[in-house]
């Protein structure tokens, strides 16, 4: 089924592109969510009239992506995590955790733009995570997972004495 994209869609195309997708993907996802419209004569005419505005918008997005890339390339995220005695993390770091930390630093990044090519981060160490900002523009941030320092004092069980 041919559809016209109403906004940029990663791995599919840019706003205004006519793309051929599977019927189920179009009917169940793209069309109901408003990411695309049917490719018919009427919609093609509308998008051809809007082409100049679309190109201008894409150029401004590209400029913003380049500026954002320069700022993000300097970002290093550090997560202090708890682990068991053998060193296994109690929970992993995923794209949502990274997006939340970036939001705290003032960067509003959609979690679908964060490429976790390692999968979820499940061990201590330093990782490079790619953030896809725009077509052909991506940033690499460093994510470091450190062990939470355990307190030197052992937890002593306190016994309560009952007086008779």
From Swiss-Prot:
Output the Gene Ontology terms for molecular function. rRNA binding; structural constituent of ribosome
Q: Name one GO cellular component term.
A: ribosome
Q: Which UniProt keywords apply?
A: Ribonucleoprotein, Ribosomal protein, RNA-binding, rRNA-binding
Taxonomy, superkingdom? Bacteria
Q: Quick check: keyword rRNA-binding in the entry?
A: yes
Is Ubl conjugation among the key words of this record? no
Fetch the Pfam families from UniProt.
Answer: Ribosomal_L9_C, Ribosomal_L9_N
What the record says about family reads:
Belongs to the bacterial ribosomal protein bL9 family.
Q: What is this protein called?
A: Large ribosomal subunit protein bL9
Which species is listed as the source? Answer: Borrelia recurrentis (strain A1)
Source lineage: Bacteria, Pseudomonadati, Spirochaetota, Spirochaetia, Spirochaetales
Gene transcribed to yield this protein? rplI
């Amino acid at each position: 089924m041919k559809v016209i994209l109403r906004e940029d869609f990663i791995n599919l195309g840019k706003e205004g592109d006519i793309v051929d997708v599977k019927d189920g993907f179009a009917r169940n996802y793209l069309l109901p969510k408003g990411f695309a419209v049917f490719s018919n004569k009427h919609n093609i005419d509308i998008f051809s009239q809007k082409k100049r505005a679309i190109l201008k918008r894409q150029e401004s997005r590209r400029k913003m992506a380049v500026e954002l890339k320069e700022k993000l390339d300097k970002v290093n995220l550090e997560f202090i995590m708890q682990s068991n005695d053998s060193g296994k993390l109690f929970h992993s770091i995923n794209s949502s955790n990274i997006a939340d930390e970036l939001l705290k630093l003032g960067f509003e990044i959609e979690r679908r733009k964060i490429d976790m090519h390692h999968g979820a981060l499940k061990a201590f160490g330093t990782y490079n995570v790619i953030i896809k900002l725009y077509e052909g523009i991506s940033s690499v941030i460093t994510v470091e997972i450190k062990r939470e320092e355990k307190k030197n004092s052992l937890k002593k069980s306190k016994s309560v004495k009952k007086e008779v």
